[in-house]
């Protein structure tokens, strides 16, 4: 029962790829932030990646790190911190865990412009859309 672990408000997940050469530095920043905020992630997963995908593929060289946070009074600060981190270091976010994705984050994917162009060709009349596609303007 998720309510038992996270309460009725639930949780949110943040997941992104950190390039190998920035991993230690960014991990220290995250640790310092969480300590300062006196908050913690109930679940953390770190995986090694070394492949390159196509378009908006989440893989890349480095480590993916995923955090689950209970939605509480710290939500805004946590969301702002991770969004700033993604922007500052041009991190690639897992689009299926898209809470912190916005239009500017999408440009961290070198193939985003090509993907956007192909989507507009396939969906020129904008008959198919979602909150996600509206947020990314695709």
Predicted regions and their residues:
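Substrate-recognition/cap regions that form aromatic- and gly/pro-loop-enriched pockets
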Residues: 1-109
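Activity-critical C-terminal alpha-helical subdomain
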Residues: 93-138
């Amino acid at each position: 029962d998720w309510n038992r672990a996270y309460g009725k408000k639930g949780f949110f997940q943040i997941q992104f790829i950190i390039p190998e050469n920035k991993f230690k530095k960014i991990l220290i920043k995250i640790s310092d932030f969480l300590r300062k905020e006196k908050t913690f992630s109930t679940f953390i997963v770190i995986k090694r990646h070394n492949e390159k995908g196509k378009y908006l593929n989440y893989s890349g060289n480095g480590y993916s790190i995923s955090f689950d946070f209970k939605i509480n009074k710290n939500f805004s600060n946590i969301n702002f911190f991770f969004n700033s981190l993604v922007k500052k270091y041009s991190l690639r976010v897992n689009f299926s865990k898209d809470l912190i994705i916005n239009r500017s984050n999408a440009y961290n994917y070198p193939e985003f412009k090509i993907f956007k162009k192909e989507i507009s060709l396939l969906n020129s009349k904008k008959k198919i859309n979602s909150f996600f596609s509206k947020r990314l303007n695709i």
